[in-house]
A protein has these predicted regions:
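C-terminal effector/interaction modules appended to NTPase cores
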Residues: 11, 19-25, 218-430
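Short, flexible loop segments at the rims of nucleotide/cofactor-binding pockets, characterized by
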Residues: 41, 70-76, 103-113, 184-186, ...
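Canonical P-loop GTPase G-domain recognition
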Residues: 126-133, 138-197, 206, 235-244, ...
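Charged, alpha-helix-enriched surfaces in structured cytosolic catalytic cores
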Residues: 22, 26, 41, 45, ...
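G-domain G4 guanine-recognition motif of GTPases
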Residues: 67, 97-103, 130-147, 164-172, ...
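Conserved G1/Walker A P-loop phosphate-binding module
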Residues: 1-78, 82, 86-87
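Conserved C-terminal guanine-recognition region of P-loop GTPase G domains, centered on the G4
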Residues: 52-60, 79-162, 197, 220-236, ...
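Long, well-ordered amphipathic alpha-helical subdomains in the mid-to-C-terminal portions
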Residues: 198-224
Length: 430
């Protein structure tokens, strides 16, 4: 991640759906005013979802997702369509693009008036309650009277769904399409802070950032950057230190430290250094609350005590990165899991968008903080785990639990602390 770029997971995700050669890529280029997507008369130019980071004013930072055609053919085409459908799990706004000139009279009169393939994805969009706009593209190919007739037919069958008529050739209708996107965009100001709601003006927040072989050269990792920015936005003061200098840092600050936020991997060492009077949590736990469901992830950690020999454990990460010899997902967590349970477990890992379709074989899922994932994608993964009856826990919560400091690590969140007492999830007595 660039130090100056908005994280992809925090951008408004706008997915574009339609048949091959409906003009999806042309619409992307016209809306952004840039040649971001390849435009070709050859069907199926877009073979996989293509992600384009972009600023669209006044929405702000967006991620435009150009998906494969809904009418793609063959076994490979079927897999491409499946990938396009999976994009809905992270979508904030959908654009359903039609070539209005190719709609037959029969298609106009059937169902929602937009064609069978389009109606199938439309039903999925509505089922997921994703706001969307119907884009009638290539309007320049029709006479005005015929265009108006078709537009009215589609509007009559689709209730309050915005319907925009555009021509990417003549550059008409684009302002109305942008207005529709602005109207449908989520209010990002209502999004839960990472830590800002826990910070008062002039509060000193101590961040413990280990610099080891896994740390990127010359910069901080994404969750650290984002927490610092959230503290600044709420007029707090960030003090960044490493584990060896933490004690001296706290001594220098005296009673000014409001809280300590650490990399979860250092939970054990940091907990011994930080006085009990200072609240302690981790970047990973903050992101569990920010993008996931903290209560569900805390409840899932107790499954650790029920694991048996031969159980399959999935360790999942939202990003892809080069693995190091002391990688947290493939080395450290499996080691802590084995050390804590004493069981012979089958550990499997996945990263990026490669989250398994079938979760039922797993006895437990241990997921990263999801800093690179869109909030909807992270919550969808948690929901799917719940549907499959598989306990899911976050890296930070798992590490705090096996290190015996779970209660302390969530004391900043009264509802979660109360849950631990109610459910008798108390690592201190074990």
């Amino acid at each position: 991640m660039s130090l100056t770029a908005t994280p992809n997971g925090d951008r408004v995700q706008i997915a574009i759906y339609g048949r091959r050669n409906a003009g999806k890529s042309s619409v992307i280029n016209a809306v952004t005013g840039q040649q971001l997507a390849i435009v070709s008369e050859v069907k199926g130019t877009t073979t996989d979802p293509v992600y384009k980071a972009m600023e669209i004013l006044p929405i702000g930072p967006c991620m435009l997702i150009d998906t494969p055609g809904l009418d793609d053919e063959g076994e490979l085409g079927k897999k491409r369509i499946e990938k396009a459908v999976q994009v809905l799990n992270r979508t904030d706004i959908a654009m359903l693009v039609l070539d209005i000139s190719k709609l037959t009279k029969w298609e106009l009169e059937q169902g929602r008036g937009i064609g069978r393939k389009e109606q199938q994805i439309q039903e999925m969009i509505e089922e997921k309650k994703i706001p969307y706009v119907i884009v009638l593209n290539q309007s320049d190919k029709l006479e005005p009277e015929e265009l108006e007739y078709r537009r009215r037919c589609i509007m009559a069958k689709n209730g309050t769904v915005p319907v925009c008529t555009v021509s990417t050739v003549q550059k008409t209708g684009l302002d109305k399409l942008k207005d529709a996107l602005v109207m449908l965009a989520p209010d990002t100001d209502l999004k839960l802070h990472i830590v800002g709601d826990l910070v008062n003006e002039n509060d000193v927040i101590v961040l413990v950032v280990p610099v080891d072989s896994a740390a990127p050269k010359g910069r901080l990792i994404m969750p650290q950057q984002q927490v610092i920015r959230d503290v600044l936005d709420n007029h707090g003061v960030s003090v960044v230190t490493q584990v060896p200098t933490l004690a001296a840092t706290l001594e220098m600050l005296g009673d000014k430290a409001r809280m300590v936020i650490t990399d979860s991997q250092a939970f054990g060492e940091v907990s011994e250094i930080v006085p009990q009077r200072i609240p302690l949590t981790s970047f990973s736990i903050l992101f569990a609350r920010h993008k996931g469901n903290l209560q569900t992830l805390v409840e899932g950690v107790t499954a650790t005590d029920s694991l048996k020999d031969g159980d399959r454990i999935l360790i999942a990460e939202g990003c892809t990165h080069r693995r190091q010899c002391d990688d947290i997902g493939t080395v450290k967590i499996p080691h802590w899991l084995q050390e804590y349970t004493g069981r012979k477990l089958q550990i499997e890992t996945c990263s990026g968008t490669g989250f398994p379709t079938d979760l039922s074989p797993y006895s437990m899922i241990i997921h990263c903080g999801g800093c690179t994932l869109h909030e909807k994608e992270m919550k969808h993964r948690i929901f799917r785990a719940q549907q499959s009856g598989v306990p899911i826990v976050n890296y930070g919560i798992f590490i705090a639990y096996v290190k015996g400091i779970l209660r302390r690590s969530v004391e900043l969140f009264p509802d979660i602390s109360e849950l631990l007492k109610k459910e008798k999830i108390d690592e201190a007595d074990r």
